[in-house]
Amino acid sequence: MPDKPTKEKLMEQLKGGIIVSCQALPGEPLYSETGGIMPLLAKAAQEAGAVGIRANSVRDIKEIQAITDLPIIGIIKKDYPPQEPFITATMTEVDQLAALNIAVIAMDCTKRDRHDGLDIASFIRQVKEKYPNQLLMADISTFDEGLVAHQAGIDFVGTTLSGYTPYSCQEAGPDVALIEALCKVGIAVIAEGKIHSPEEAKKINDLGVAGIVVGGAITRPKEIAERFIEALKS
Protein backbone atom coordinates (compact mmCIF):
# COMPACT_ATOMS: atom_id res chain seq x y z
CA MET A 1 0.00 0.00 0.00
CA PRO A 2 1.59 3.33 -1.08
CA ASP A 3 2.09 6.26 1.27
CA LYS A 4 -0.71 8.80 1.20
CA PRO A 5 0.20 11.61 -1.21
CA THR A 6 0.28 15.29 -0.32
CA LYS A 7 -2.31 17.49 -2.01
CA GLU A 8 0.33 18.88 -4.38
CA LYS A 9 1.61 15.43 -5.31
CA LEU A 10 -1.91 14.11 -5.87
CA MET A 11 -2.83 17.08 -8.04
CA GLU A 12 0.22 16.37 -10.19
CA GLN A 13 -0.89 12.76 -10.55
CA LEU A 14 -4.52 13.58 -11.39
CA LYS A 15 -3.93 16.47 -13.77
CA GLY A 16 -5.10 15.78 -17.29
CA GLY A 17 -6.28 12.26 -16.48
CA ILE A 18 -9.43 10.30 -15.74
CA ILE A 19 -10.44 8.93 -12.34
CA VAL A 20 -12.73 5.95 -12.90
CA SER A 21 -15.56 5.37 -10.46
CA CYS A 22 -16.00 1.64 -9.83
CA GLN A 23 -19.23 1.16 -7.90
CA ALA A 24 -22.27 -1.09 -7.85
CA LEU A 25 -25.09 -1.04 -5.32
CA PRO A 26 -27.48 -3.85 -4.32
CA GLY A 27 -30.00 -4.40 -7.09
CA GLU A 28 -27.59 -3.41 -9.86
CA PRO A 29 -26.32 -6.05 -12.34
CA LEU A 30 -22.65 -5.82 -11.30
CA TYR A 31 -23.32 -5.99 -7.57
CA SER A 32 -22.24 -9.16 -5.81
CA GLU A 33 -22.71 -10.02 -2.14
CA THR A 34 -19.40 -11.85 -2.23
CA GLY A 35 -17.44 -9.05 -3.94
CA GLY A 36 -14.74 -9.61 -6.53
CA ILE A 37 -16.23 -7.53 -9.34
CA MET A 38 -15.13 -3.98 -8.56
CA PRO A 39 -11.40 -4.85 -8.51
CA LEU A 40 -11.78 -6.24 -12.04
CA LEU A 41 -13.23 -2.92 -13.17
CA ALA A 42 -10.42 -1.10 -11.38
CA LYS A 43 -7.84 -3.33 -13.09
CA ALA A 44 -9.37 -2.54 -16.49
CA ALA A 45 -9.32 1.17 -15.64
CA GLN A 46 -5.68 0.98 -14.63
CA GLU A 47 -4.72 -0.85 -17.82
CA ALA A 48 -6.51 1.86 -19.81
CA GLY A 49 -4.39 4.52 -18.13
CA ALA A 50 -6.71 5.85 -15.41
CA VAL A 51 -5.00 8.08 -12.84
CA GLY A 52 -7.25 7.16 -9.91
CA ILE A 53 -10.24 5.17 -8.71
CA ARG A 54 -13.37 6.24 -6.82
CA ALA A 55 -14.89 3.40 -4.82
CA ASN A 56 -17.63 2.73 -2.29
CA SER A 57 -17.50 0.55 0.84
CA VAL A 58 -14.70 -0.85 2.96
CA ARG A 59 -14.88 -4.22 1.21
CA ASP A 60 -14.61 -2.86 -2.33
CA ILE A 61 -11.80 -0.48 -1.40
CA LYS A 62 -9.76 -3.23 0.25
CA GLU A 63 -10.22 -5.48 -2.78
CA ILE A 64 -9.18 -2.67 -5.12
CA GLN A 65 -6.13 -1.83 -2.97
CA ALA A 66 -5.02 -5.44 -3.37
CA ILE A 67 -4.68 -5.08 -7.14
CA THR A 68 -3.66 -1.46 -7.74
CA ASP A 69 -1.57 1.33 -6.22
CA LEU A 70 -3.66 4.01 -7.94
CA PRO A 71 -4.91 6.71 -5.54
CA ILE A 72 -8.41 5.99 -4.29
CA ILE A 73 -11.20 8.44 -3.53
CA GLY A 74 -13.22 6.48 -1.01
CA ILE A 75 -16.82 6.83 0.10
CA ILE A 76 -19.31 4.83 2.11
CA LYS A 77 -22.91 5.03 0.97
CA LYS A 78 -25.32 4.52 3.85
CA ASP A 79 -28.87 5.79 4.17
CA TYR A 80 -29.92 7.72 7.26
CA PRO A 81 -33.65 8.31 6.71
CA PRO A 82 -35.45 10.64 6.86
CA GLN A 83 -32.38 12.76 6.06
CA GLU A 84 -31.21 12.61 2.44
CA PRO A 85 -27.38 12.74 2.64
CA PHE A 86 -25.95 9.23 2.28
CA ILE A 87 -22.39 9.63 0.93
CA THR A 88 -20.04 9.38 3.94
CA ALA A 89 -22.74 11.16 5.90
CA THR A 90 -21.36 10.87 9.47
CA MET A 91 -18.09 10.57 11.36
CA THR A 92 -18.69 6.81 11.66
CA GLU A 93 -18.12 6.38 7.93
CA VAL A 94 -15.17 8.79 7.98
CA ASP A 95 -13.55 6.68 10.71
CA GLN A 96 -13.98 3.51 8.65
CA LEU A 97 -12.44 5.13 5.57
CA ALA A 98 -9.59 6.78 7.47
CA ALA A 99 -8.50 3.34 8.67
CA LEU A 100 -7.93 2.25 5.04
CA ASN A 101 -5.09 4.72 4.35
CA ILE A 102 -6.69 5.96 1.12
CA ALA A 103 -5.66 9.13 -0.69
CA VAL A 104 -8.96 11.01 -0.39
CA ILE A 105 -12.17 10.68 1.60
CA ALA A 106 -15.22 12.17 -0.14
CA MET A 107 -18.32 13.17 1.78
CA ASP A 108 -21.68 14.83 1.26
CA CYS A 109 -21.27 18.57 1.74
CA THR A 110 -24.67 19.74 0.53
CA LYS A 111 -26.80 22.10 2.59
CA ARG A 112 -29.46 19.44 3.22
CA ASP A 113 -30.37 18.46 6.77
CA ARG A 114 -27.92 15.91 8.13
CA HIS A 115 -28.33 12.91 10.40
CA ASP A 116 -25.75 14.31 12.82
CA GLY A 117 -27.45 17.71 12.93
CA LEU A 118 -24.24 19.55 12.04
CA ASP A 119 -23.81 22.23 9.43
CA ILE A 120 -21.25 21.42 6.76
CA ALA A 121 -18.54 23.80 7.95
CA SER A 122 -18.70 22.27 11.44
CA PHE A 123 -18.55 18.71 10.07
CA ILE A 124 -15.53 19.51 7.90
CA ARG A 125 -13.74 21.15 10.82
CA GLN A 126 -14.40 18.13 13.04
CA VAL A 127 -13.03 15.74 10.40
CA LYS A 128 -9.94 17.90 9.83
CA GLU A 129 -9.25 18.09 13.56
CA LYS A 130 -9.53 14.33 13.92
CA TYR A 131 -7.60 13.47 10.74
CA PRO A 132 -5.33 16.46 9.97
CA ASN A 133 -3.27 14.56 7.38
CA GLN A 134 -6.22 13.14 5.43
CA LEU A 135 -7.15 14.73 2.10
CA LEU A 136 -10.87 15.45 1.85
CA MET A 137 -13.30 15.99 -1.02
CA ALA A 138 -16.67 17.71 -0.75
CA ASP A 139 -19.46 16.27 -2.88
CA ILE A 140 -21.63 19.31 -3.59
CA SER A 141 -24.48 20.37 -5.89
CA THR A 142 -24.24 24.19 -6.07
CA PHE A 143 -21.64 26.94 -6.18
CA ASP A 144 -22.52 28.19 -2.70
CA GLU A 145 -22.07 24.70 -1.23
CA GLY A 146 -18.67 24.44 -2.88
CA LEU A 147 -17.64 27.82 -1.53
CA VAL A 148 -18.70 26.94 2.03
CA ALA A 149 -16.72 23.68 1.88
CA HIS A 150 -13.68 25.44 0.42
CA GLN A 151 -13.76 28.13 3.10
CA ALA A 152 -14.02 25.42 5.77
CA GLY A 153 -10.72 23.98 4.53
CA ILE A 154 -11.75 21.13 2.23
CA ASP A 155 -9.02 20.04 -0.20
CA PHE A 156 -11.13 19.28 -3.27
CA VAL A 157 -14.66 20.20 -4.32
CA GLY A 158 -16.53 17.67 -6.44
CA THR A 159 -19.59 18.51 -8.53
CA THR A 160 -20.89 15.00 -7.86
CA LEU A 161 -24.35 15.93 -6.64
CA SER A 162 -25.38 18.62 -9.13
CA GLY A 163 -28.77 17.48 -10.39
CA TYR A 164 -29.24 15.12 -7.47
CA THR A 165 -30.57 17.72 -5.04
CA PRO A 166 -33.96 19.30 -5.81
CA TYR A 167 -32.56 22.85 -5.78
CA SER A 168 -29.55 22.27 -8.05
CA CYS A 169 -29.24 22.51 -11.84
CA GLN A 170 -31.20 19.68 -13.49
CA GLU A 171 -29.22 18.91 -16.64
CA ALA A 172 -28.98 15.65 -18.58
CA GLY A 173 -25.24 16.19 -18.90
CA PRO A 174 -22.45 17.60 -16.73
CA ASP A 175 -22.96 20.94 -14.99
CA VAL A 176 -20.23 22.74 -16.92
CA ALA A 177 -21.31 26.18 -15.65
CA LEU A 178 -20.85 25.06 -12.04
CA ILE A 179 -17.46 23.49 -12.77
CA GLU A 180 -16.29 26.65 -14.54
CA ALA A 181 -17.54 28.98 -11.79
CA LEU A 182 -15.75 27.01 -9.06
CA CYS A 183 -12.52 26.89 -11.07
CA LYS A 184 -12.64 30.65 -11.65
CA VAL A 185 -12.50 31.40 -7.92
CA GLY A 186 -9.44 29.22 -7.44
CA ILE A 187 -11.04 26.09 -6.00
CA ALA A 188 -9.46 22.69 -6.72
CA VAL A 189 -12.38 21.11 -8.58
CA ILE A 190 -12.87 17.43 -9.23
CA ALA A 191 -15.50 17.36 -11.95
CA GLU A 192 -17.94 14.51 -11.51
CA GLY A 193 -21.48 13.69 -12.52
CA LYS A 194 -23.15 12.87 -15.85
CA ILE A 195 -19.95 13.01 -17.90
CA HIS A 196 -20.99 10.68 -20.70
CA SER A 197 -18.46 11.17 -23.47
CA PRO A 198 -14.74 11.72 -24.10
CA GLU A 199 -15.67 15.02 -25.77
CA GLU A 200 -17.36 16.26 -22.58
CA ALA A 201 -14.35 15.18 -20.53
CA LYS A 202 -11.98 17.07 -22.86
CA LYS A 203 -14.10 20.22 -22.66
CA ILE A 204 -14.14 20.01 -18.86
CA ASN A 205 -10.40 19.34 -18.65
CA ASP A 206 -9.78 22.53 -20.60
CA LEU A 207 -11.50 24.52 -17.82
CA GLY A 208 -8.56 23.83 -15.50
CA VAL A 209 -10.05 21.25 -13.15
CA ALA A 210 -7.89 19.34 -10.68
CA GLY A 211 -9.40 16.04 -11.78
CA ILE A 212 -12.26 14.35 -13.63
CA VAL A 213 -14.29 11.39 -12.37
CA VAL A 214 -16.19 9.26 -14.88
CA GLY A 215 -18.36 6.44 -13.59
CA GLY A 216 -21.47 5.21 -15.35
CA ALA A 217 -20.18 5.88 -18.86
CA ILE A 218 -17.32 3.44 -18.20
CA THR A 219 -18.32 1.00 -15.46
CA ARG A 220 -22.10 0.57 -15.69
CA PRO A 221 -22.77 -1.65 -18.72
CA LYS A 222 -26.54 -1.52 -18.26
CA GLU A 223 -26.46 2.28 -18.45
CA ILE A 224 -24.14 2.18 -21.46
CA ALA A 225 -26.37 -0.30 -23.29
CA GLU A 226 -29.49 1.73 -22.50
CA ARG A 227 -27.92 4.81 -24.08
CA PHE A 228 -27.37 2.94 -27.35
CA ILE A 229 -30.83 1.37 -27.27
CA GLU A 230 -32.61 4.67 -26.55
CA ALA A 231 -30.67 6.37 -29.36
CA LEU A 232 -32.13 3.94 -31.89
CA LYS A 233 -35.66 4.64 -30.64
CA SER A 234 -35.46 8.39 -31.12
Curated annotation (Swiss-Prot):
The keyword Secreted does not apply. CDD domains: NanE. It is an enzyme of class 5 (isomerase). One of its GO terms (molecular function) is N-acylglucosamine-6-phosphate 2-epimerase activity. Pathway: Amino-sugar metabolism; N-acetylneuraminate degradation; D-fructose 6-phosphate from N-acetylneuraminate: step 3/5. Keywords: Carbohydrate metabolism, Isomerase. It catalyses: an N-acyl-D-glucosamine 6-phosphate = an N-acyl-D-mannosamine 6-phosphate. Belongs to the NanE family. Converts N-acetylmannosamine-6-phosphate (ManNAc-6-P) to N-acetylglucosamine-6-phosphate (GlcNAc-6-P). This is Putative N-acetylmannosamine-6-phosphate 2-epimerase. The lineage of its organism: Bacteria, Bacillati, Bacillota, Bacilli, Lactobacillales.
